[in-house]
UniProtKB/Swiss-Prot annotation:
The keyword Iron-sulfur does not apply. This is Putative uncharacterized protein YbfO. Sequence repeats lie at residues 9-37, 38-62, 63-97, 240-264. Residues 9-264 are annotated as: 4 X approximate tandem repeats. Belongs to the RHS family. Keywords: Repeat. Signal peptide: none annotated. Gene3D superfamilies: RHS repeat-associated core.
Amino acid sequence: MWPDNRIARDAHYLYRYDRHGRLTEKTDLIPEGVIRTDDERTHRYHYDSQHRLVHYTRTQYAEPLVESRYLYDPLGRRVAKRVWRRERDLTGWMSLSRKPQVTWYGWDGDRLTTIQNDRTRIQTIYQPGSFTPLIRVETATGELAKTQRRSLADTLQQSGGEDGGSVVFPPVLVQMLDRLESEILADRVSEESRRWLASCGLTVEQMQNQMDPVYTPARKIHLYHCDHRGLPLALVSTEGATEWCAEYDEWGNLLNEENPHQLQQLIRLPGQQYDEESGLYYNRHRYYDPLQGRYITQDPIGLKGGWNFYQYPLNPVQYIDSMGLASKYGHLNNGGYGARPNKPPTPDPSKLPDIAKQLRLPYPIDQASSAPNVFKTFFRALSPYDYTLYCRKWVKPNLTCTPQDDSQYPGMDTKTASDYLPQTNWPTTQLPPGYTCAEPYLFPDINKPDGPATAGIDDLGEILAKMKQRTSRGIRK
């Protein structure tokens, strides 16, 4: 028995914790009778006020072997890390590298979809509504650099002066040109844009000739083969060759790996990302230690996650914890948090080339955490759901406060859909003049008392069922 479930030692290490129950130090255990000369390695962990790991070091002989720092966005998702490793400098001494290796991360909700460093960018497409990876797309940084191009507005501004010099367009004109360029690239120029060009004495073909060519980078595409939990076991090329494979134990520890092509495959158990510098698996809200089969910090949701604050599912063969919160059934088949895994789908390699054509991101990697994910459009095209943003309660200022005011919005005139006949869902863009939306919401047709508590936009199983139901009625939103 360990006090507060904090393991102080095992067969390999000694552990220390702070007053918040966070692992702060892990040191090699020297067996009794063995004479050592302070050569044990010590791992140290440092956290911010939100209990997120922000600094890690590993030392031996009081000398640093590796150091890393981690950066998070306001939602607590890790968006970057810097790693310094011990190497020999110009004088022959061993020390930490002066220049760190920097890695950036891009997200789609709680799923990590993009990893980029100075050499390559790796994108992951997941099974809809789950954390099971389906497709891996790798693009070299050199290829990404070739995709850089000027926008149509920039091209015209740089050479639009009377003497061939630069000129500055008003923001409204830049916006119109950007919209026109996107329509030309999609081969769907609207009648409104055609009329605007005609009024200027221009044609679509003339504007298209002014645009920089679009470069399609070369990519390496692989299909994931996963077990029933969503743990990757192999990467298969578009030619059907297995170019990476691995074996793991029940807790996600790597037992054997065959990697002749030196592919970087860091996905472990659902929702987990392997950090080579520390040996830990980043698991969204916490870090998982596969050697112990538990987390290094306490559960951020407290007792809602179980009596043991450090516990990973005790039956990892049947249960997962893709969010680092709790082991229990979730809304999504293989998502939510602590969901029971479902059988992965049968992959179809013939579809890979067509999907890869859609993977050019319209934003730089350092904006990926806040930009919409490009893969989401695949599933929205199939969805029968209404993606309109509706308003549950809208308000505008009153001249005076009255006892009838809503207690949540004193001094405000408050309206809801029940104040009108017929009662219906009110889009935020169609509110009465002077009112602003105080409580917006999405998916009114699935957030009913008899429906699920939450809805994922890419929950494909529910989407297809609803599509079939509505098609049989002759109705399609």
